[in-house]
Amino acid sequence: MMIPSGECTYAGRKRRKPIQKRRLTMGTEKSNPSKRHRDRLNTELDHLASLLPFSPDIISKLDKLSVLRLSVSYLRVKSFFQALQETCVWSAPALSPEDHSSRGFPVQEGRLLLESLNGFALVVSAEGMIFYASATIVDYLGFHQTDVMHQNIYDYIHVDDRQDFCRQLHWAMDPPQVVFGQSPHADTDNTVLGKLLRAQEGGKGLPSEYSAFLTRCFICRVRCLLDSTSGFLTMQFQGKLKFLFGQKKKTPSGTALPPRLSLFCIVAPVLPSVTEMKMKSAFLKAKHRADIVVTMDSRAKAVTSLCESELHPKLNYLAGRSNGENVISLFRGQTDRSHWTRALARSSCLCLRGGPDLLDPKGTSGDREEDDQKHILRRSPGARGQREMHKYSYGLETPVHLRHLDWSTEQRSQEGTTKLTRQPSKSEPSTCLVPHGSCVPYPGSQGMFSASNMASFRESLDHPTGTYCSQMNRPLPDIHQGQVDPSTCHIPQGSLGSRIPLSGMQCFTARGFSTEDAKLPSLPVNIGTPCNPVLSLEVPIKMENESGSQDIVEASTTSCVWLGTGDMTRRHLVGFPARMHLKTEPDYRQQVCTPHRGHGILGTNPHSRDTVGSCREHAPLYSAHCTCLSPEPPHHLFMCSHSESQHPSLDQDCRAPIVKREPLDSPSWAAPGHVTVPRMFPKNASITVIPSKGSDGIFLP
């Protein structure tokens, strides 16, 4: 049988259920010869169908043509096995007693062998007729055995693979082009096939020189009812060409034809490639995302003045992990207790000046508080996604000496301003007494304070940027993790902004990082952390003086804004818009400032001296997005030397101011979801400070 010509049609499942026959009652009805003939034919077909080796439920679904086709196929298969026994190509092995069951019937090995195959058995004649197909074909192609037996194989092969399949059926893979109805054998084919047939009939087996020509292994696309996407399944045919005995075919003249080579093979499905594999499991169906991101914000690289090659080998080179929408920014780092902790990027955070150490407010309580923090994040309205930043330990710097800062005041009555200049210290590193509530401009800069207590900087800023009011990165220098012990000062629970982490403290390492805007409601106020009440710079504020304080101007009693230096600071000066009043009471010794990387306030014993070895600097570290108000009760920060630690006196005062809100004609407080941070001072905004009573303190460079 050759490849069917004409339109390309494929086989399908078209079994028809036979019509149920009813017995006619003998009566007065007239006899119909044609009807009696059909009845006899149907009876014979039913008897023939019952002889087929199929179950009754399968036989009941067969039509008349299927019964005849399967009967012919069954007879041909039976004739093949009879011919094998006559030619004695192989002798059937004797069955041992173990091969019989307890009932005396032999074990059905054929069924077990078919079930163990990764595929199904198939025999295709030289004409392309399916001589035999095992019952396991239904598991791979969806066609039942009765559907394909004695059918044309080309109805199941893809139209583009039919020519290749026809070549595989020829012993030389070069089938001759013959006219339909004539014998496809040529003289060469007859000679070769005759030689092979005589060798096989004599029991010698196939000659070795022809074995390579008779082995087949190829791939074709086969019609499949189980795959609804394309309708074809790629299958691998692996087997050999063997003679199909017992067919007893004849030429039109009546001459018997010799047996033909047929394909005996096992058909197995080919595994699809990785790109074509279906994503069936839940893990593979998940949205693909980069597990680790090692890119760094360009603004952070500009601040640190480091190129990509310098940042890549650093241990603190940030690795980001994005989950969902970037609504809440989180930072995660490993604490000194060898467990991971998280901190909100937009909330206030205690940090240590001169180093990358952060005070984790929930590290001391372990995983329980970490779970509480996660619960807070899930409760927040804006907590639809999270962004975690991993930070690693960074190198430590050498200890630095404490230097005394000498300041002198020059008053100019005409201009109504006061100029502050710093005098170089001639003594050894020591401590000095500075009233609380005051701060000093950045070293190397001159601060001008007018009679209305407006501060400005005149000299160029030549140091790296510390803290400024923007949403850019903030680099933190290195410092040892154990140089500062947390204080136990009380923090008012209703601080402005209420962006304080949970209670408890732990040190973990951080460096310069970039954060994204996060919408997060108020968080609980931290208790027991130094200088913890934080006023977010997102809220525009204005300070008012009390009456009678306009003429009091001292360098040691004025509040100011701490600014870093460098080009970044000149472009992004910290400012407070004049849209809201912030009224402070002078009795509470307030201090309103923004922290920077070069200054801190240390309370210590006025009689302390520099001991053996150099002392380290200690000061609270603040987030780059907030200003700091000193806490309400006194707290104790101390210096650690190589030989001893000296504690400050208990009379130092560190109180948070009482903030009063007053309505204005202009728009009132910003909305809670307002996250925009101004980068520059409005020209009409002014910062008025109130001098307060002095207290002991020390300023560090």
From Swiss-Prot:
Keywords assigned: Cytoplasm, DNA-binding, Isopeptide bond, Nucleus, Transcription, Transcription regulation, Ubl conjugation
Tissues where this protein is expressed: Highly expressed in testis and weakly expressed in heart and liver. Highly expressed in small intestine and cecum in a male-dominant sexual dimorphic fashion.
Compartments it resides in: Cytoplasm; Nucleus
Polar residues compositional bias, start-end: 414-430
GO BP terms: negative regulation of DNA-templated transcription; negative regulation of transcription by RNA polymerase II; nitric oxide metabolic process; positive regulation of protein sumoylation; regulation of transcription by RNA polymerase II; xenobiotic metabolic process
Region (Disordered) residue spans: 1-38, 360-389, 409-436
Compositionally skewed regions (Basic and acidic residues) per UniProt: 365-375
Entry's induction text: Increased after TCDD exposure in liver. Highly increased after TCDD exposure in kidney, spleen and heart. Up-regulated by 3-MC in small intestine.
Bias-annotated ranges (Basic residues): 12-24
Subunit structure comment from the entry: Interacts with ARNT, ANKRA2, HDAC4 and HDAC5. Interacts with ARNT; forms a heterodimer with ARNT.
Record's protein name: Aryl hydrocarbon receptor repressor
